[in-house]
Amino acid sequence: MTEEKIQSYRKKIYVIRQKLKAKKPRFLRYDSDKFFRLGRQEKWRRPYGRDNKTRLKVRGFPAIVSVGYRLPKEVRGFHPSGLRQVIVHNVNDLVKVQNQKDSVIVTIASSVGFKKRLEILNKARELGLKVSNEGVSA
């Protein structure tokens, strides 16, 4: 594929992804708007109550997490920039991704420490890779 075709394909996928994500509701815990302690937890917990209207999928109540909300496989795993996101744990992982630098953005894993993070950042700059969560000035 030529560079123009790749760019247009990437842009097309990004637009599709944004449209689908806009339709998807924000899944919050039931009654999180009524009780502060639940609202703080801004994470989904499945309702199991006998008469819970959300669990029963009654109209007018929040949507419940289900399989149908998942994005298509071609669109999944993209960074907002439209590039494929790759998680990196060490410098060797960077070398593996080096030949795809036009279509990939690197994310340094959260478990990586400060020293190794600096090594990864320096190597990424050498190889000309984009890093999404630099966060540290090396």
Curated annotation (Swiss-Prot):
Pfam families: Ribosomal_L32e (PF01655). GO terms for biological process: translation. GO terms for molecular function: structural constituent of ribosome. Keywords: Ribonucleoprotein, Ribosomal protein. GO terms for cellular component: cytosolic large ribosomal subunit. InterPro entries: Ribosomal_eL32, Ribosomal_eL32_arc, Ribosomal_eL32_CS, Ribosomal_eL32_sf. The keyword Ribonucleoprotein applies. Belongs to the eukaryotic ribosomal protein eL32 family. HAMAP family: Ribosomal_eL32 (MF_00810). This is Large ribosomal subunit protein eL32. It comes from Saccharolobus islandicus (strain L.S.2.15 / Lassen #1) (Sulfolobus islandicus).
